[in-house]
UniProtKB/Swiss-Prot annotation:
InterPro entries: NAD(P)-bd_dom_sf, SDR_fam, Sec_Metab_Biosynth_SDR
SUPFAM superfamilies, per the entry: NAD(P)-binding Rossmann-fold domains
GO terms for MF: oxidoreductase activity
Organism: Stachybotrys chartarum (strain CBS 109288 / IBT 7711) (Toxic black mold)
Gene: SAT3
The name this protein goes by in its record: Short-chain dehydrogenase/reductase SAT3
Length: 271
């Protein structure tokens, strides 16, 4: 995402992560443009520290992507098990702490990230009115590209398939509704809220679903068939983010954009 934004002309991109080594490695590729900030989204103090750094450095943001995520417990409601085995798998073998931590990172952490940056997003709109990015297309008008939050949800938010881990699915489903709620209630302030719900893109979280697979060789009879016959890649993700961030996507607010190669259309889902 950050690579796409920089390639699209972003003057500065702040990247937040708990892992300093990941931050420093990413920032080294774009020194002075990609700014690393160590941050834990489950800590209000850490979020405030990140906000303070951005406030001091630039004073505003035009776009906030809340991309935090953890898979959490992978114990599923597997109907190949007996009812005794099923209970043991999902009750005895999963702790309240592990289940709730999934929601803490994926839902609460993402939501509080948005809340922490509200004033900086508002400042982004004010900067646009002064001639900055997203300035009015007509004199005296509103910003042509209003400040925006993009929440990264997931295909899992809409999945009813037994392969979907319940904690992860619940956390992303909750996030999608929080985003819709926020888009309604932040409209007064000119802050847009949209959701990106990706399917299978190779990543740490997706390893369980992508390892030892070649979607190009699969067909409709395969349980995890993807109609596009490929996993998502940098172009699909980067292009989608650029669309939402640009004038082309400036009319989107409260949108759930599913980017999944058609996977949702061939599985048990709620979408």
């Amino acid at each position: 995402m950050s690579e796409a934004l920089i390639g699209g002309g972003a003057k500065k991109v702040y990247i937040l992560s708990r892992r300093r080594d990941v931050l420093e490695s990413a920032a080294a590729k774009h020194e002075g443009i990609l700014i690393p900030i160590q941050c834990d989204v489950t800590s209000k103090a850490s979020l405030q520290s990140a906000v303070d750094i951005v406030t001091k450095d630039s004073g505003y943001v035009n776009l906030l992507i809340a991309n935090s995520g953890t898979l959490g417990p992978t114990n599923r409601l597997d109907h190949d098990l007996s009812i005794h085995e099923l209970r043991k798998n999902v009750f005895d073998n999963v702790s309240f702490e592990d289940f709730n931590n999934t929601l803490s990172v994926n839902t609460t952490g993402a939501y509080f990230t948005m809340l922490a940056f509200l004033e900086l997003l508002d400042a982004g709109n004010k900067n646009a009115l002064k001639g900055g990015f997203g300035g009015p297309s007509t004199e005296g008008g509103a910003p042509s590209i209003q400040s925006q939050v993009i929440f990264t949800s997931s295909l899992g938010a809409y999945s009813r398939d037994r392969l979907s881990p319940p904690a992860y699915s619940a956390s992303k489903s909750a996030l999608s509704h929080l985003a819709k709620h926020a888009s309604t209630n932040l409209a007064k302030y000119g802050i847009r809220v949209n959701v990106l719900a990706p399917g299978l893109f190779p990543s740490e979280i997706a390893t369980l679903m992508t390892a030892n697979r070649d979607p190009a060789t699969e067909n409709l009879g395969d349980r995890m068939f993807i109609p596009a016959r490929k996993f998502g890649g940098a172009e699909e993700m980067g292009g989608t983010v650029l669309y939402l961030a640009s004038r082309a996507g400036s009319y989107c607010n409260g949108l759930i954009l599913v980017n999944d190669g058609g996977r949702l259309s061939v599985m048990l889902s709620e979408y």
